[in-house]
């Protein structure tokens, strides 16, 4: 993103910059802000088998600080935030941009993008479960007798979180930033208060300790990397939420608040363990005096709920992008705000996430156990993003191959090492995110492939629209009766006569005064300006071809978009217009090009898809559906 390409950033007032930066603290940094609850604790475990040494503690903190510096600061904050698609970030946004310039390896790029999106959806299940569990576990330090109630309390909190999604969070979202900012300030204060326990912890800024530890610890060093990576979980949110806040507010929030607070807190935890080794069982909560524990647990729970909310909202947005880009079937999308079309609720996605999150909490029961499963989905998503970023700088910024390799290969290698370290935890629950991501990838790939096969098969039997119109406009005794009004026929192929039009002629023997062949197309950019929304092409006296263009971040409100067509002279009353939709009954074919099980999956997805009249927000009492059988 450049300031020139986004005038609202170039002319942003200091006041607006402050409020956007504050808002980004709650949404963008909520996930990474909950990592101190468990990251250092988990990193200590692999080396605690024979007691931790001073060198090991300083080295672990050094690894965490430099992971935050290299992966979050350099890769995401300074580099990836500039690799935008008209201001939007995220895996599918980057994929949509690359699809415009892909040369010969479109399928590989698509598969990578789908894997990245699937890993993010897996992360959307694990993050709420792990974050809330880790916060509520602080209760056992307040009152040990509450230990047995941690799982039930976590389940209740998470259940309430998913229940309120349908009502929207607009009313309380304005508090997310301030609450999370207080959380970061409290963490920073706790860190500062304990650095004096052992000023030797400041040596962690020296990368010598991080490198030396990895070189000397061997296998344990690799295992530790899996836990160290927990410090950077949530970094993908920086890129995914780029379009909501803009580059500068996200960068300012990182450098002025988030990065310093995280660094100070990790230094404080390290100094505490150096001074009091017995605190390594839970260094985060043991930084606070007994009287402050309950307020900190409450604040931590609020912060984890906000982090979970941000991930859930991100999942809704990602799925809508997937639907609009043709990677997922249409789903019911409800708008929870009358003024902000970005505030959406997808009941089916909410249900899948809810059951997945509750299953994880009941299965793993502790944040210790769940943390082992967490890193794989995040490291996988980061590796995918880095590979796609390599393609981006080559295709969009015209970097030469040597420059791109020199700049990005070290990042990819580092993240591959982190991924390898996390893969060591497959038997301890690491298989869970792999299974989740595989399932989502198969669903998206099946939908994309099945839709392409279906279009190819129907194209062989379709009648070219130009030929059809030419024949129907010739007057003869067999011409259909003409009736007043306008008929709009929705079709995915503007070059062929819609099946609904042919069936209407076959069964009703009528043709309207005005007939519009309407195609809805999603372009590979986030939004389409209103003056570029439509393309109108007269075919004959009674037929017109109209194409409505939407960005992948937009709601496809066809009724509203058609109202703008009046500017072209194509006048009609939406409430006296009939919309004709084709409904296909799909039948599996052994020679479809996909395995039988994939045929069945595609048909199941098609049957479960939202009704197009609801999805495109057409007036229900003006819609006519005509069915047909199609063998896929």
Swiss-Prot record:
The protein's name: Probable potassium transport system protein Kup 1
HAMAP family found in the cross-reference section: Kup
Catalytic activity of the protein: K(+)(in) + H(+)(in) = K(+)(out) + H(+)(out)
Disulfide-bond pairs as recorded: none
Domain of life: Bacteria
Subcellular location per the Swiss-Prot or TrEMBL entry: Cell inner membrane
Organism expressing this protein natively: Rhizobium etli (strain ATCC 51251 / DSM 11541 / JCM 21823 / NBRC 15573 / CFN 42)
Entry's family note: Belongs to the HAK/KUP transporter (TC 2.A.72) family.
Entry keywords, A to Z: Cell inner membrane, Cell membrane, Ion transport, Membrane, Potassium, Potassium transport, Symport, Transmembrane, Transmembrane helix, Transport
GO cellular component: a single term: plasma membrane
GO molecular function: potassium ion transmembrane transporter activity; symporter activity
Annotated membrane topology: Multi-pass membrane protein
InterPro entries associated with the record: K+_transporter, K_trans_C, K_trans_N, Kup
Gene name for this UniProt entry: kup1
Functional note: Transport of potassium into the cell. Likely operates as a K(+):H(+) symporter.
Residue intervals passing through the bilayer: 17-37, 60-80, 106-126, 144-164, 175-195, 210-230, 254-274, 292-312, 344-364, 370-390, 401-421, 426-446
């Amino acid at each position: 993103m450049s300031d020139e390409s986004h005038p609202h950033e170039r002319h942003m007032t200091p006041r607006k910059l402050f409020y956007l930066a504050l808002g980004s603290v709650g949404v963008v940094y909520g996930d990474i802000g909950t990592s101190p609850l468990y990251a250092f604790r988990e990193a200590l475990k692999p080396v605690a088998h024979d007691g931790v040494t001073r060198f090991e503690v300083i080295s672990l903190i050094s690894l965490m600080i430099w992971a935050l510096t290299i992966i979050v600061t350099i890769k995401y904050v300074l580099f990836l935030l500039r690799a935008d698609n008209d201001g939007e970030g995220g895996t599918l946004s980057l994929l949509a941009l690359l699809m415009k310039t892909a040369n010969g390896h479109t399928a590989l790029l698509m598969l990578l993008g789908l894997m990245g999106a699937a890993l993010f959806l897996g992360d959307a299940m694990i993050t709420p479960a792990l974050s809330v569990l880790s916060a509520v576990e602080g209760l056992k330090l307040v009152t040990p007798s509450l230990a047995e109630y941690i799982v039930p309390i976590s389940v209740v909190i998470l259940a309430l979180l998913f229940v309120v999604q349908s009502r929207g969070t607009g009313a309380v979202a304005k508090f997310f930033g301030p609450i999370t900012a207080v959380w970061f300030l409290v963490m920073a204060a706790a860190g500062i208060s304990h650095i004096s326990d052992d000023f030797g912890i400041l040596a962690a800024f020296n990368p010598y300790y991080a490198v030396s530890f990895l070189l000397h610890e061997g296998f344990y060093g690799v295992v530790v990397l899996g836990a160290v990576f927990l410090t950077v979980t949530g970094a993908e949110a920086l890129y995914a939420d780029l379009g909501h806040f803009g580059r500068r507010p996200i960068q300012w929030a990182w450098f002025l608040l988030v990065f310093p607070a995280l660094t100070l807190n990790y230094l404080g935890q390290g100094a505490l363990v150096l001074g009091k080794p017995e605190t390594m069982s839970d260094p985060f909560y043991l930084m606070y005096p007994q009287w402050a524990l309950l307020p900190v647990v409450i604040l931590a729970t609020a912060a984890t709920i906000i982090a979970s909310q941000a991930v859930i909202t991100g999942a809704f947005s990602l799925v809508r992008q997937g639907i609009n880009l043709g990677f997922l079937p249409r789903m019911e999308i409800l708008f929870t705000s009358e003024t902000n079309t970005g505030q959406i609720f997808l009941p089916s996605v909410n249900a899948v996430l809810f059951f997945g999150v509750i299953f994880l909490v009941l299965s793993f029961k502790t944040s210790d156990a769940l943390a082992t499963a967490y890193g794989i989905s995040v490291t996988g998503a980061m590796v995918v993003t880095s590979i796609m970023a390599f393609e981006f700088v080559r295709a969009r910024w015209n970097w030469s191959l040597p420059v791109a390799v020199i700049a990005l290969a070290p990042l990819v290698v580092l993240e591959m090492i982190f991924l390898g370290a996390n893969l060591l935890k497959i038997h301890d629950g690491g298989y869970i995110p792999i299974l989740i991501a595989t399932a989502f990838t198969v669903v998206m790939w099946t939908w994309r492939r099945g839709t392409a096969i279906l279009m190819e098969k129907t194209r062989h039997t379709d009648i070219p629209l130009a030929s059809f119109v030419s024949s129907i406009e010739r007057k003869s005794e067999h011409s259909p009766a003409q009736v007043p009004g306008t008929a709009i026929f929705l079709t995915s192929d503007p070059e062929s006569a819609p099946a609904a039009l042919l069936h209407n002629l076959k069964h009703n023997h009528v043709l309207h005064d005005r007939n519009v062949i309407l195609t809805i197309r999603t372009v590979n950019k986030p939004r389409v300006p209103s003056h570029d929304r439509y393309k109108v092409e007269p075919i004959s006296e009674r037929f017109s071809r109209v194409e409505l263009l939407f960005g992948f971040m937009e709601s496809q409100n066809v009724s509203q978009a058609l109202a703008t067509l009046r500017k072209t002279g194509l006048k009609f009353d939406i409430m006296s217009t009939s919309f004709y939709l084709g409904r296909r009954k799909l039948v599996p074919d052994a020679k479809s090009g996909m395995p039988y099980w994939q045929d069945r999956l595609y048909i199941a997805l098609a049957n479960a898809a939202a009704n197009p009249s609801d999805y495109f927000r057409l007036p229900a009492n003006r819609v006519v559906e005509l069915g047909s059988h199609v063998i896929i």
